[in-house]
Amino acid sequence: MITGYDGGGGAAAVVVGASGALGSAIASRLAGAGLVVVGVARKPVDAAGVIGCAADIGDDAAVDVIRAAVDDVGLPVRMVVQAAGLPAAGPLPTIDPTALGSAVSLKVGGMLRLVRAVADRLGPGSRLVALGGHYGTEPSPHTCAAGVTNAALANLVRQLADHHGPDGVTAHLVAPGPADTDRLRRLSQARADERGVDVEEILAERRAESPLSVLVTPEQVAWAVATLLDPEADALTGSTLALDVGARRGI
């Protein structure tokens, strides 16, 4: 069911998408903070100190798989993080509507599945964290699925905050801008191929969206998520923490 657990520790975290760039950075950071981390992914998890749990968060069967893994650890859950990445579903003019629905099921439905899997182990001070993204509030026809899904995720986080607040459990959306990951480079390469330009030109355009002319790093995202463990983060429940290096233009 799970791999790599030796029976130690005092509280657990569950990170979905732990084989990806953002999820693995978050899982490693939380493990470094002293939590016993269960890393959920379809692929093998290769993050130091992280327990692997094979499950597809887009499938309802993941609820029982994750619940069993957490029960094997036998600790209260201090934090869950839904960091599953979306497949490249295409721009607005050509996206398959079915693919859009699948994206919502993966990220938004996946957050519900994750919370239900650990519900019996939540308590005062537990954090429910979802990774959204810049395009949830800055719509772009090039990123249809990401925009629609991350906007819906922000709404779900507010609902989770309202529902779980009386139990002392908080909910948070962390919304990075375009992050410097292999996935971003693959998407940028696809756009470069469409336009007949070099991929570095596309990456430069993405960096130029920020007044700092940089991309967010996985380490910065992991830092922000770990900061939510602080008791002062109660004040942030239901809100969105934007990590877009100034790219968002809305007020």
Stretches with model-predicted labels:
Residues 19, 27:
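N-terminal Rossmann NAD(P)H-binding glycine-rich loop of SDR-like oxidoreductase domains
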Residues 71-72, 106-126, 161-162, 230:
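Amphipathic alpha-helical dimer-interface segment in Rossmann-like NAD(P)H-dependent oxidoreductases
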Residues 165, 170, 236-238:
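Short, small/polar-rich loop/turn modules that mediate ligand/substrate recognition or access, typified
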